[in-house]
C-alpha cells in the first residue's frame, strides 16, 4: 500500500509505504536489529507500555533532539519503555548513544529490509528511510496513540505522546 503525499521533506511531497495506523489498531509485529546485532520482534520488547519513536536518522538535528528528549523523559515514566527506530546502522546508533550519553532509550535499526517501516506505514519510498512518527503501544500491543509528522523536518507532538503513555501505564497498573 502506497500513500502518495502522506509526508513532506522541506515542502516536497513524498510517498509512505504501508498502512496508516490509528489508535485502537493492533500493533503489527516487526523484525529489527539492536546494537548487539540481535534480532528484536514486538514480543521481545516486553510487557510494559512502549513509545516507539521513529526517526529518519540520528545524524540530523530534529532526530537528535527527539531522541535526547525521550531519553530525558524516560526516567519520569515508570512502566514505560522507549524504543527509537531508524534506518541507521546499529554501529552508528551505538556510537551516537555513546557520544551523547543516551542510555534510557533502546535503539533499534530497520536497515535490513525496512519491514518495520512498511508494517507501520513510515517507510519513505523515494528515500528508503523512515518518516518521523510516534506510536504508543499498551501492554496488549494495541496502538493507543499514533502520530505521523506531516513535515519530516518538524518535531512531533511530544506532550500528546507522553500523555498517552502515562494514561496507558496508569490503566495497566490499575
Label the predicted regions:
Residues 1-174:
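Chalcogenol-based redox active-site neighborhoods
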Amino acid at each position: 500500500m502506497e500513500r502518495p503525499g502522506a509526508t513532506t521533506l522541506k515542502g516536497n511531497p513524498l510517498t509512505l509505504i504501508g498502512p496508516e495506523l490509528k489508535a485502537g489498531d493492533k500493533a503489527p509485529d516487526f523484525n529489527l536489529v539492536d546494537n548487539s546485532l540481535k534480532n528484536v520482534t514486538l514480543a521481545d520488547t516486553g510487557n510494559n507500555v512502549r513509545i516507539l519513536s521513529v526517526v529518519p536518522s540520528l545524524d540530523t538535528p530534529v532526530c537528535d533532539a527527539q531522541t535526547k528528549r525521550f531519553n530525558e523523559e524516560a526516567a519520569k515514566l515508570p512502566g514505560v519503555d522507549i524504543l527509537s527506530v531508524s534506518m541507521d546502522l546499529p554501529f552508528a546508533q551505538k556510537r551516537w548513544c555513546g557520544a551523547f550519553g543516551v542510555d534510557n532509550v533502546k535503539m533499534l535499526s530497520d536497515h535490513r529490509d525496512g519491514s518495520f517501516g512498511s508494517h507501520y506505514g513510515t517507510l519513505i519510498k523515494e528515500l528508503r528511510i523512515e518518516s518521523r512518527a510516534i506510536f504508543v503501544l499498551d501492554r496488549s500491543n494495541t496502538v493507543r496513540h499514533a502520530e505521523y509528522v506531516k513535515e519530516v523536518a518538524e518535531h512531533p507532538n511530544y506532550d500528546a505522546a507522553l500523555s498517552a503513555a502515562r494514561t496507558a501505564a496508569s490503566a495497566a497498573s490499575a
